[in-house]
Amino acid sequence: MEMNARLALTLSGIFMFAAVALGAFGAHALKGHLDPDMTAVWQSAVQYHAWHALALLGVGSLMLHWPQKRGLALAAWLFTAGITLFAGSLYAVALTGMRGLGMITPFGGVAFLAGWAVLAWTAWRA
């Protein structure tokens, strides 16, 4: 599937909806059910999830102005992968207590870093 402004903006909306819902779920439904360490893991997942959904919103907006910049599409895919792998694995660790799932988290972190690097490079060359 090709990443374009419409898809990036749609994914951003979906990811932000999910981040808000998961933040509320963690603050209310999980309150008292997770130990403090796992609560911190959950909060980190929500924070990185939301920030990078906003980054995806920004990239999607830039794609409206520069649709020919393929680097923007790559950055959008990298932020999408980062949210899925980084935040997704942290949510799973917090809910299950299976710390081994945390081995996935660095792959999401690398995707976030690569997304920011690609975005910076694309902007520099614009």
Predicted regions and their residues:
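Polytopic transmembrane helical bundles with strong interfacial aromatic enrichment
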Residues: 1-126
